[in-house]
Amino acid sequence: SGGSLGNIPITVAADAYWNPLGPTLLADGSVNPNRLPGLVGVPDEGLPVTIRSLNYVDAGMKTVNVTNYQYRFLGGLRGSFGDWNWESAGLYTWATVKDVMDGTSSTLLQAAINKTTPDAYNPFNGGCVDTPSVGDCTVNDPSVIDSFRIQSTRRNKTTLALWDLKISNANLLDLWGGNSIGIASGVEFRRETYKDDRDPRQGGVAGVDITYTDAVTGIFYGSDLMGASPSPDVSGRRKVWSAYAELAIPLVSPEMEIPMIRSFDIQVAGRYESYSDVGDVAKPKIAASWDLLQGFRLRGSWSQGFRAPNLEVLNTATLDRVNGGTEYVLCEADLRAGRISSFAECARSVSVLRRSGGNPDLKPEESTSWNFGAVFQPPLPDGMGQVTFTVDRWRIKQKGVVGLLDYQNALNLDYLLRVQGSSNPAVVRREPTADDIALVAGTGLEPVGELLYVTAPFQNLLPIQVDGIDFNLDYRVTTSSFGSFGLNVNAARLIKYQIDAPAAVQAVIDAQADGTINAAVPVSGGGDVVNRDGQPRWRISGNLTWDYGPVRIGAFTQFISDVYQNDVFDAAGNNFVVDGQTTVNLYATYKFDQGMMKGTAITIGARNIFDKNPPLASSGYLSSLYQPQARYWYTSIKKSF
């Protein structure tokens, strides 16, 4: 089924047949049986009703058919001359996706609702007078439902054409002790294209697409596809030239027998890329590894990197999306007027339309990173297998990360500026009504009009620094009687995730500190976000396998530590904590190695074997961390030729 968006409402006309606030008399002069009795303040001609959030369940389930094709053509040559090896290849690949989905037309739905005869669609049905939570005594006729059901189609295509030339020489220059400097370098050209063709009912462009204008209010909303914000077609292309080089320099080798330096290697590399749309960029890298003893290695690296903005964020015209937010300026009015005693009682939730768009002036994201660590492979007695333990401490600093200023931060800044007597121009509102004026009367605040949308174009944001430490344990052993066993455990600890606050966010933080606005307003997009929302401090996973002839049995487990929700508080002002979770998957595989079934592997498995629910959060669960699927079994057959 499908539901409406809060920012694209359906207005039920005053004279619509099923309007519970409709006229006292129908068009034929008979008494309106659908007008609620005992209404006060509702005129005889009735009043319109605005539907902002309703799931039209009797419209049936949505079926989505996805057709995906991928093609790849690759050809190349390789050869050598002297100590040099070379390789050149050409590649062309493209992928197409077609999504066909059942949907609802807002225009046709409103027309069906606003009929003045009994064959109108009734959005207020469900339940019965005597049993309101059971059954439906006012079922809509299927032909009425069919009048506004549609199918929407979205087509997407990407292409990549690439040519490259690589050369390498493992003995470019002789060094002491029989060592040699090796080199690898190359050039590359690629052409990328992207096209996203939305359904005409979702494009939102007047005169081009099938759009929705509320027939009662006359307000233009763009998208006629219910539950979908306006999304125009997007297309873009770019050409990229790149070149790279890498030197491998072995300064010390085991044959040199230097105490405490079994080997010492250095890697020096660099890469340059020239984009037709975002300019040029060049970045270096240096890495080193030092084997003190056999089985014990220290390693480290320092590098700079970059990532170009994708074609969608560069070329999108206007992109509307709806999220839930809170109007804290109205909470301030409620607090000053005595309607609430604290912000914990605030109930000013609102649907926020975020209006973003592509930005052709975006620059590549840039990063500087380092890591150092150790690898320990202690010798074990014969028959005991091999164990490897690694630990790596790392840091990544990013600048110019492509993103959007959070819509709630824009509302928070509007709250601050309105307390100071102005407003945030990125927050667009209607002119205040009489009710809006009455709401702030006596509070010292200026009237606040209904929220229309928040503008938030893609931009290069301020720096981010992420620190962490990774641990890995890998153990393998093969026995003569019981097959082979493998154990791998990974643990990642997030130490720091510092986001430099944009000016708008920092202004809110400072205003909270000096008491200008309420300190209970949650602020995102600034500070250290470890343990907050989607950034748990610990992630641990383990994989255990047993191989015996053609049989493999395996188990996988994953643990994610708890986090707190930045925008959810209890009455004491404490953040709501979302519990951690551990899940387990099991599988068994049988691989045939002879006969007609040779190369065939059959797998039976179960994911989330203990049927764990995702931990409770304010939105149900945190989709960025957890999967909602219950325990389920699966089987697969794979054939290798």
Language-model-detected regions and their locations in the chain:
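Transmembrane beta-strands of outer-membrane beta-barrel proteins
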Residues: 1, 86-88, 181-187, 243, ...
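Surface-exposed, low-complexity loop segments enriched in small/polar and acidic residues
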Residues: 1-240, 254, 303, 307-364, ...
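Outer-membrane beta-barrel translocator domains and adjoining extracellular loop/strand segments
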Residues: 2, 69, 99-105, 196-202, ...
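Residues that define the transmembrane beta-barrel architecture of outer-membrane proteins
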Residues: 67-71, 159-161, 237-243, 280-282, ...
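Short loop/turn motifs that connect adjacent beta-strands in outer-membrane beta-barrel proteins
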Residues: 79-86, 170-181, 252-264, 295, ...
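Transmembrane beta-strands of outer-membrane beta-barrel pores
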Residues: 81-83, 92-98, 171, 187-195, ...
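C-terminal beta-signal and adjacent terminal beta-strands/loops
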Residues: 108, 388, 399, 495-498, ...
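C-terminal beta-barrel architecture of Gram-negative outer-membrane proteins
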Residues: 321, 490-596
